[in-house]
Amino acid sequence: MRRRLARDGILVVVLDQAGNPQVHGYGLPLDEDYDAFVAEAEADIGKALGRLKGAQARDREAVMEAARLAARRAAQRWSGKKPQTKVIMAGEA
């Protein structure tokens, strides 16, 4: 895993209690474009969470997986890498 982290980087997605995302990336080759990438990734996560309906929207695991996939897909579009992605929800230890 250590080599994969060094090669592909890592994304950390933090969802507050209202479901607003914050994205932090480490080791991604996006020096000049980092701020634009973060803005697009956060927008993509918001759209993905908005598509969840009914029981899925209330299921913590489904919300975390939708956010993880949206952030990872944005990173792949921008950098060509598939970083390890961790989602942390407010109130989670």
What kind of region is each of these model predictions?
Residues M1-A93:
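Acidic/His-rich, metal-assisted hydrolase cores and their charged scaffolds
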